[in-house]
Structures are given as structure tokens and as C-alpha cells.
A protein has these predicted regions:
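N-terminal helix-turn-helix
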Residues: 2-73
């Protein structure tokens, strides 16, 4: 992939991650993976990968009891 292509992909990934964060911020409480995926226009597997990255960065968290996601603290 060319350098320009890599930059475009990186920017797209950041935009998608921000969209997932916006969905989390708009929820009243924790949300299920399917709801986050649908609101973000992603497949469940794509949303799960973005959520895993956001959790690793401390920007989101998953409730161990319910499996639902919300903004990190």
C-alpha cells in the first residue's frame, strides 16, 4: 500500500473509532454490542474490535456481569 493509502486508512480508522465513542456517549447507560454496531454502521465483529481497542486505551469499559459497554472513566 502506498504512503497516501496508509494515511487514508489511518484517518478512516480514527473516524470510525470516534463514531463508536459518540455512540457510547449518546447512550443512557451501558449498551449492547449489537446496538453499538448498528448505530455505528458496523458489523458486530468490527464494532467489537474497535471496542477492544477503546477498552485497552481506557476510553471504554465492558461490564463483566452484563457484557454491555459504556464510556471509560
Amino acid at each position: 500500500m502506498s504512503e497516501a493509502g496508509e494515511r487514508r486508512q489511518g484517518i478512516q480508522s480514527v473516524g470510525i473509532g470516534l463514531r463508536v465513542l459518540e455512540v457510547l456517549a449518546s447512550q443512557n447507560g451501558a449498551a449492547a454490542l449489537g446496538a453499538i454496531a448498528q448505530a455505528s454502521d458496523l458489523s458486530a465483529s468490527q464494532a467489537h474490535r474497535y471496542l477492544a481497542s477503546l477498552i485497552a486505551a481506557g476510553m471504554a469499559r465492558q461490564d463483566a456481569a452484563t457484557g454491555r459497554y459504556e464510556l471509560g472513566s
